[in-house]
Amino acid sequence: RQAYLEGGRPVIIPSAEGSTFGGKMFPSVVAFTKDGERIVGDPAKRQAVLNPENTIMHIKRKMGTKHRVNIKKKKYSPEEISAMVLQKIKADSEAHLGVDIEKAVITVPAYFNDNQRQATIDAGKIAGLKVERIINEPTAAALAYGLDKEGEYTVAVLDLGGGTFDVTIMEMDNGVFDVISTSGDNNLGGTDMDDALVDYLADLFKEENGIDLRDDQAARQRLHDAAEKAKIELSNTLKSTINLPYIWSDSSGPKHLEHDFTRAKLEDIVGPVIAKCEKPIKQAFKDAKMKPGDVDKVILVGGPTRMPTVQEAFEKFVGRKAERGVDPMQCVAMGAAIQAGVLAGDIKDVVLLDVTPLTLGIETEGSVMTVSYTHLRAHETVV
């Protein structure tokens, strides 16, 4: 998602050919066609079933690692794949605004470490962008929510994205955004729910036919797309039908998969994933020296938080109803635009005080990290 500032207000920039949520969502998917053409975003996602071996998804979890993607006998780093997504976002934004874009504020999960943050900056450079600031996603969401809010509030931001989960507790006081604590899990998100649903469907098919669809890339991608679609539908309905004709064929003939999903069954399957979110939430409150229920406002961020079962679980964990006037899909990009406006001097009287999510230290003999509380900032220190 990308946004810019117009008249002091953040505005979402739609992707050029996007169909996801009216073009206001940009899938971080990169693919290479048989002819070697590179496609990014919605077009890449749409062709994934027919070209799974040359389609890259979920690269965010690999940022800052030595992981390499092998496509058509060429190796790509996570930074290079991420840069391809940023290049497409940059091109769409330039086409929409009619100006060249050279600088950007980029958001990252709050619990990203230094390697992951530097990798994000490197991706921006490869894409032709000077990264003016890296800002934590929950903090950006709070900026979007609290820009025009007067008074003093303590806010908990729960950000459940596709691949990561972050919890940030902050104080908002008439334009001052002071982060008290942050916690998270960089390997927990909506993707894990999709995987759980895929496993459920694959196990059903295997039980009936003796075939594991997970062993076939194309069949697995069809399962994933169907699971994701059902998950979204069941946020608004109580029943969804998965119908995948000709998902397999062998000497005995074609085989189909049809299954009626209820919201109750969905909640049962994804429940263990949601339960894992409780630990980072408790840690954030512990670091803030607060108890659940002490906060005045709760903001939910990220696509999976549109699910009623996620909303109910998070409200139970925190002990307070979530705010309903926040768009969980767009507020992070809008917050990044606000931060860009602050840096450019277009927005006044906004002060952001964030913390280090991880402890800083020095490596001593034997590859041991030594933390010096007198000279080096410790975990949860304001910077």
Where do the PLM segments sit?
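Oxyanion-binding/catalytic loops of NTP- or PPi-dependent enzymes
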Residues: 1-65, 69-75, 84, 91-377, ...
